[in-house]
A protein has these predicted regions:
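N-terminal Rossmann-like NAD(P)+-binding subdomain of aldehyde/semialdehyde dehydrogenases
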Residues: 1-159
Length: 159
């Protein structure tokens, strides 16, 4: 295992180690904390041409299932030990706070507050979607059509 974690770019859900990388450094000492793969516009355009594959992969799940997965991810983010990159590293929530604080200069308390906000957003995604969609039933998003307040409605994703 490398001493410095490498965070790959994700291309259609798969890790991708790019030739173009940037280093994340400790803002005080200059020590390299991680290496991050980056992709350019050309690769992004190429991946967008295959957007149908990504949509098909997501279609295997209902919106309710995706909301439940997001809530579980929020709990892991706030309380778990998660994989960090593709070289076998892991990171606890406390290590995340220390690393983000040392690379950004943000005080630990602000990093923790932001973590709490991310956790809240992920664990309350159903409420967020309900507000953004003005109460559109989730099965309408799943099927593409349905009924809301006695009126026929349809839904079609644009990207």
């Amino acid at each position: 295992m490398s001493a410095v974690p490498h965070l790959p770019a994700l291309r259609r859900g798969r890790p991708y180690e790019s030739l173009e990388k940037t280093q994340v450094v400790n803002h005080r000492t200059g020590e390299v904390m991680a290496e991050v793969s980056q992709i350019g516009a050309g690769i992004l355009r190429k991946d967008l041409r295959a957007i149908g594959e990504a949509r098909a992969a997501l279609k295997r799940f209902t919106v309710s299932e995706l909301i439940a997965i997001s809530a579980k991810a929020g709990e892991f983010f706030l309380n778990g030990e998660l994989p960090l990159g593709d070289k076998g590293h892991t990171q606890t929530a406390d290590q995340y706070v220390a690393t983000l604080s040392s690379t950004s200069g943000l005080p630990h308390v602000m990093v923790r507050r932001n973590m709490t906000k991310i956790h809240y957003a992920l664990t309350n995604l159903g409420t967020v979607i309900n507000g953004l969609s003005r109460g559109l039933p989730l099965d309408v998003i799943d099927r593409g059509f349905g009924e809301q307040s006695g009126a026929a409605v349809s839904y079609y994703p644009t990207t």
